[in-house]
Amino acid sequence: MTNIRKTHPLAKIINDSFIDLPAPSNISTWWNFGSLLGICLILQILTGLFLAMHYTSDTTTAFSSVTHICRDVNYGWIIRYMHANGASLFFICLFLHVGRGLYYGSYMFPETWNIGIILLFTVMATAFMGYVLPWGQMSFWGATVITNLLSAIPYIGTNLVEWIWGGFSVDKATLTRFFTFHFILPFIILTLAVIHLLFLHETGSNNPSGIPSNSDKIPFHPYYTVKDALGALLLTLTLMTLVLFSPDLLGDPDNYIPANPLNTPPHIKPEWYFLFAYAILRSIPSKLGGVLALVLSISILAIIPLLHTSKQRSMMFRPLSQCLFWLLVADLLTLTWIGGQPVEHPFIIIGQLASILYFTILLILMPAVGIIENNLLKW
């Protein structure tokens, strides 16, 4: 008798995706982050669902409803902190996942890569709107500053900002619509993630060598299910350590002060995972220029496949490209640090130099080094 998992219409889909899926035999731990992102997403949806049961999206009660969740709801504090710190781990996994894609040339699967970029933008939008919901000082002023950037768009800018706000300032209407979108977007992300997987399974996974591995495939289960289970265990351990020992480590203390439109915090800054983009935004004196640089800092990923000049897919055997890649990582860490600093000397010039270096590495140096490496190998 044929196994039900291979014949049943629904079980067959799961079987072909997670059990009998042919996978390269040499994929490393860097390939674990896809499954970890899936776990993060499900965790965020579940904790978010329970938070939404007790949260009220009204400017007068939003802050106190979060306090109520932490003080009065059974295990509300742990749900709230798992959701907040889960977002941080989500972004850590996202950045490592994208970094893996850049290093090993996974961007040569254009459909999967482009859906991934859309996913990145959607997750960033969701996280930004979620940060506004507790209605603390940084929530309010972060929302005001970031939405106000759209006013830099010529001609329609001001109307666009007021349309998003639902009035002449960030107020009740803004909070309500942000809650609505913050609730619906994770389900859109889930759908996009399924499409992302669908496109990936059309081509099969890349591997560290960048060489087609069709002649050497192994079943996903048990090899990679066990490997993913270990990753999940370590992710859970990291999350719970963060939640139970230092839940506010990655948050901003200003967000424990209720939102007050009459009192501006000394340093308005977003969550840590947006600081690199925020530093690029601030490093350009012109408002419109800054907004364009901000958008380009992420959307530049879309043209990475066009800038691939090397005859090898992966960076595994390309030491010069490896040096540039790690320089890019160091540069992004520098930008993250600068984004959290006040706008004063020497941080301004460091931010400007780091921003220039970021675009120079991706647009000029990496393609040039690819050509140099081809010539060194006489290819």
Curated annotation (Swiss-Prot):
Protein source organism: Lontra felina
Transmembrane segments: 33-53, 77-98, 113-133, 178-198, 226-246, 288-308, 320-340, 347-367
InterPro entries: Cyt_b/b6_C, Cyt_b/b6_C_sf, Cyt_b/b6_N, Cytb/b6-like_sf, Cytochrome_b, Cytochrome_b_C_euk/bac, Cytochrome_b_N_euk/bac, Di-haem_cyt_TM
Entry's Gene Ontology molecular function annotations: metal ion binding; ubiquinol-cytochrome-c reductase activity
Cited CDD domains: cytochrome_b_C (cd00290), Cytochrome_b_N (cd00284)
Binding-site residues, a ubiquinone: 201
Protein's name according to its UniProt entry: Cytochrome b
Family affiliation: Belongs to the cytochrome b family.
Cellular compartments per GO CC: mitochondrial inner membrane; respiratory chain complex III
Family annotation (Pfam families): Cytochrom_B_C, Cytochrome_B
CC cofactor: heme b
SUBUNIT field: The cytochrome bc1 complex contains 11 subunits: 3 respiratory subunits (MT-CYB, CYC1 and UQCRFS1), 2 core proteins (UQCRC1 and UQCRC2) and 6 low-molecular weight proteins (UQCRH/QCR6, UQCRB/QCR7, UQCRQ/QCR8, UQCR10/QCR9, UQCR11/QCR10 and a cleavage product of UQCRFS1). This cytochrome bc1 complex then forms a dimer.
PROSITE patterns for the chain: CYTB_CTER, CYTB_NTER
Cofactor note: Binds 2 heme b groups non-covalently.
Residue numbers binding heme b b566: 97, 196
Topology of this chain in the membrane: Multi-pass membrane protein
Any single GO BP term: mitochondrial electron transport, ubiquinol to cytochrome c
Keyword Metal-binding: yes
Gene symbol of the encoding locus: MT-CYB
Other remarks in the entry: Heme 1 (or BL or b562) is low-potential and absorbs at about 562 nm, and heme 2 (or BH or b566) is high-potential and absorbs at about 566 nm.
Subcellular location: Mitochondrion inner membrane
Keyword annotations: Electron transport, Heme, Iron, Membrane, Metal-binding, Mitochondrion, Mitochondrion inner membrane, Respiratory chain, Transmembrane, Transmembrane helix, Transport, Ubiquinone
Superkingdom of source: Eukaryota
PANTHER family found in the cross-reference section: CYTOCHROME B
Main subcellular localisation: mitochondrion
